[in-house]
Amino acid sequence: MNHIEKWLKSTPTFDCGNKSIEEKAKDITKGYEEASDKARSLFYFVRDEIKFIPHLPVGVLESYQASKILKARGGMCIQKAILLATLARAVGIPALVHFVDIRNHRVPTKIKEVLGTNLFPYHGYNELYIDGKWVKAAPTFELKVCQDNRLIPVEFDGKHDALLPSHDLGGNPHIEYLQDHGRYENIPLDKIHDAWTQAYGLEARRGLNQFIEVRKAKSRHLRR
């Protein structure tokens, strides 16, 4: 197996051989022949149809399994990146998750208060191998989140890098890229959770997850 082919294989998290993943990937890319067009269509599906939920899953493998993320229709940056990489692999595009620490200067005040910081270790974005080169893409925030918060949405054409922007629509600082952790063939759960514990502490992580669950419950109640 060469250095490109290994980013096509199915793993416990990148379960691209799962029936639901295969069917969804084929449905999204139906009618497209070029890898860049397929990648673009998959990107926008994950960006906008998979809701960004800023929770911090404790080390349960299923929380990071692409087929489970697809079924849940929501997840944090790492989970959305896992799903995009897996859908891409399902249609023959080598893809991976790249990890980096970021500082989000536009993080909601309540979340910053709970965590005690705007630092987010091990943010995950994608790299996809298209037309002989690796292209970066971050499907983190859906369009509605960007519109509601005056953020610049990430737009991806399947050919050029598309990462989270440094400033928002008002010119205020948004994302600051810090330490690069690189690529991993398997999701480094131990390193991720150690970094989260060091940055936030266990109580803050539990507090954030409880806060998100309350918000989700309120949202379900309003939809009734």
What residue ranges belong to the model's regions?
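Secondary-structure boundary elements
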Residues: 2-72
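Active-site neighborhood of thiol-dependent amide/isopeptide-bond enzymes
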Residues: 54-122
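A sequence-composition feature that detects small, non-aromatic residues
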Residues: 25, 35, 39, 66, ...
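His-Asp-centered catalytic microenvironments across diverse enzyme cores
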Residues: 2-3, 9-13, 102-224
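Residue-level signal for well-ordered alpha-helical scaffold segments within enzymatic catalytic domains
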Residues: 44-48, 86, 90, 124, ...
